[in-house]
């Protein structure tokens, strides 16, 4: 998408420039109106007691977010800097800064600082076609986030960043995100059984990162999430990846319209049924291309086997041997002979030496989602073959 910048006329008369200055002043109310015109398609609107304009800075006073259904959520003062009106009547905002959060509920206090969105494009007409009709942002950032209960910090996040980059040829987007230094204190668990499990598994203090990376190609509607990883110290790394096609701009518009109609219907039961039917229709456009789930162990497997074994009066090794013996018996009931041996071999390899376990699906050609749903309901044992499922360990 091309982010048009406001054209600045090169005029030679200083007096004329002075007179023209007011003509090019930003219209704060028009900006808010167009933000809401685009945002209502995504779930709500923003209200403000006042809109102040100072050069290219627009301040939304005492702002609140009102979902299409539900109570308004107070936000406070939102500062929009580097605001420019595009030639087509849309807007570009260099940065939107939100007030810090400090709220207490049920004895727990949540604080969050440094909340910003960057490179925001507000469409002139959200009902139009193409990227110019979408509300987009280039980056989202938060500083430290903390949850404190009874004087102790039970959760914290060092910070987060999400980036959305339009390709030069406007064929699609690349995106990535990182939620760094996520920490959770589980020592305050009140349930005795939960506390015992936490202690045995050495999960009293969890520390790790969540990262993601992917791309969206607009014409075929291909969303390729190559990384959605949960990486925790002394636990392991779980990575989810998937690729689907058919998620095109018209699909997005249809999805938004279906959601809007459901929100507008006062009969919620009827609205849910109508939305469900709409979703079934839209699902016809989506196809599954590939998926992978991979776990790289960082010592949690041995502790889990030891704990599970202790609950059954056996050692961790005995529990592992028991699982290896049970796996082929359980798989035999599923009637998937082409996968049974591979799964059993992978489980045996992993339990003997826990390093990694991978489940992947890569059909020879994209499979329409309705076909997958039909197979799941009518002949679930055919799914591994339809999707090209493979299981491996320590590779």
Predicted regions, residues:
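Absolute protein N-terminus
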Residues: 1, 24-26
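Asp/Glu-centered strand-loop micro-motifs enriched in Gly/Pro and often flanked by an aromatic residue
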Residues: 1-2, 65
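Bacterial N-terminal signal peptides that target proteins for export
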Residues: 2-11
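Generic hydrophobic/packing signal
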Residues: 12-16, 219
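N-terminal signal peptide c-region/cleavage motif recognized by signal peptidases
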Residues: 15, 20-23
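Glycine-rich, small/hydroxylated-residue low-complexity segments
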Residues: 26-395
């Amino acid at each position: 998408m091309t982010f048009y910048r406001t054209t600045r006329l090169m005029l030679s008369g200083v007096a004329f420039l002075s007179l023209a200055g007011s003509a090019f002043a930003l219209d704060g109310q028009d900006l808010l109106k167009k933000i809401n015109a685009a945002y209502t398609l995504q779930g709500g609107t923003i209200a403000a007691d006042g809109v102040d304009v100072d050069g290219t800075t627009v301040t939304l006073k005492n702002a609140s977010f009102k979902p299409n259904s539900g109570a308004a959520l107070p936000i406070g003062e939102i500062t929009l800097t580097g605001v420019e009106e595009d030639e087509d009547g849309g807007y570009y905002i260099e940065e939107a800064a939100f007030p810090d959060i400090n709220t207490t509920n049920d004895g727990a206090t949540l604080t969050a600082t440094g909340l910003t969105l960057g490179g925001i494009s507000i469409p002139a007409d959200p009902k139009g076609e193409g990227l110019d009709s979408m509300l987009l942002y280039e980056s989202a950032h938060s500083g430290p986030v903390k949850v404190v209960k009874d004087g102790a910090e039970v959760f914290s996040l060092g910070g987060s960043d999400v980036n959305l980059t339009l390709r030069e040829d406007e064929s699609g987007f690349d995106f990535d995100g990182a939620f760094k230094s996520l920490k959770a204190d589980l020592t305050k668990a009140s349930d005795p059984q939960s506390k015992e499990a936490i202690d045995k598994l050495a999960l009293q203090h969890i520390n790790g990162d969540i990262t993601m990376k992917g791309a969206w190609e607009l014409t075929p509607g291909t969303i390729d999430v190559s990384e959605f990883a949960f990486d925790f110290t002394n636990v392991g790394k779980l990575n989810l990846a998937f690729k689907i096609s058919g998620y095109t701009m018209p699909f997005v518009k249809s999805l938004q319209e279906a959601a809007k109609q459901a929100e507008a219907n006062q009969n919620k039961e009827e609205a849910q049924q109508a939305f469900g039917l709409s979703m079934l229709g839209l699902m016809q456009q989506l196809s599954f291309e590939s998926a992978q789930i991979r776990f790289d162990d960082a010592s949690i497997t041995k502790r889990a086997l030891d704990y599970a074994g202790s609950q059954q009066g056996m050692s961790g090794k005995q529990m592992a041997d028991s699982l290896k013996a049970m796996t082929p018996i359980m798989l035999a009931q599923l009637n998937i002979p082409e996968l049974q041996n591979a799964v059993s071999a992978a489980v045996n390899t992993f339990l003997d030496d826990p390093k990694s376990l991978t489940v992947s699906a890569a059909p020879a050609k994209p499979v329409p989602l309705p076909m997958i749903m039909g197979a799941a309901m009518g002949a679930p044992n055919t799914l591994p073959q339809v999707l090209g499922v493979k299981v491996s360990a320590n590779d």
